[in-house]
Amino acid sequence: MRKLLVLLSFLSVGFSQINDKNFKSEINGGVTVCVFTSEWQEQPFDKDIVKGVKGYQDAEIIYIKSEEAPKVTKKLRLRNFPSMVLFYDGSKKETWKADMDGELDIDNKDIKSAIDDVLAEDVF
């Protein structure tokens, strides 16, 4: 029984949903790349875009369903999905929005470059 409780608590932490209430706590602290998706998006998210980004300069990647965080999605002015937003210590630094066809015109090198730029700003 104890093992089952430990397993259930681990699973609930590992697969928690990001929503309007917990969004700020999830992006606060270091580099966070948020991938916003929607049930109705034109194109599925190409995970190769973020390949190699997780862990780069201690970056975290979180996936957010726009339907689960409508206030955050509206505040960030995201209308096409998938879209991505780079945060550093809770502050928005860069936004990549999909075009009308749901295409994101970036790759992991663009994201890594943006992370480097953000961290270079923090030095001065």
Language-model features and meaning:
Residues T32-C34, I61, M84:
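Hydrophobic beta-strand anchors of alpha/beta hydrolase catalytic cores
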Residues E60-E68:
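Short, internal strand/loop/helix patches
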Residues E39-E42, E67-A69, S91-K93:
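Solvent-exposed loop/turn segments at secondary-structure junctions
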